[in-house]
Amino acid sequence: MSARDIVAINREFYDALWSQTYVERPERFNTWPLISGLLPSAPLRLEIGPGLRPRLPIAGTHFIDISTPVVAKLKARGGIAAPGEITALPFGDETFDLVGAFDVVEHIEDDRRVFAELGRVLKDGGILVFAVPLHARFWTEFDACVGHARRYEPADLLALLADHQLVIEKSAGFGMQPNNPRLLKYGMKWLTQHRAAAMRWYNWVFMPLGMLFQKRLKFRPGLVDPAGLAEIVLVCRRLPR
């Protein structure tokens, strides 16, 4: 699949997903204890590809998203939102103290360019918080449906970070995707055959239920043992130039 095809799949899927739902408050996510602890030293903030589930506080944060409904709704809530892509961020070098990108990087074919851009806009010593799915062996129809270009092998991810002067401070297992094969297969059937109805159920039933049953993130210094993890969230610091 070409990079252009992946972008088109992402835009079509997420425009439809976000066009008829609401902005969730960042404070409701299990990432909030982490994010809120970073805010005092992060006056300049950017979140990329938040959808309507931002993890950084909306007011005063810059947001970049490919989805038009997302940009409009975040602006209405006080965010500094603009359309754009993670491979060409419309900001100068060394702009931000904190950058977030949750479930975004895996959607981009040219991930080296992604990390080059993330490292470019971060100040020296700035923090990158991002989440990606792990292990090609866990690839499912869902990955293809939502526009994933890959799932990461831990060694490849470590090499990418090192190449772009990003050092892992801590990490944890992450994600809300169901791991029950039958449930996933049933969900995929609805997504492919009854997409509009499936998205309504996701936005108004399954996502709210998932929020109620979120588990506390268990961070470990450096890279948490990735064996068996389907997804990971990492806190990285930008080394001085």
Describe the function of each predicted region:
Residues 1-94, 98-102, 112-115, 172-174, ...:
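Conserved N-terminal segment of class I S-adenosyl-L-methionine
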Residues 45, 122, 143:
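Short glycine- and Lys/Arg-enriched binding-loop motifs that mark or flank ligand-binding interfaces
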Residues 3-13, 17-29, 109-117, 127-239:
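S-adenosyl-L-methionine-dependent methyltransferase catalytic module, highlighting the catalytic core
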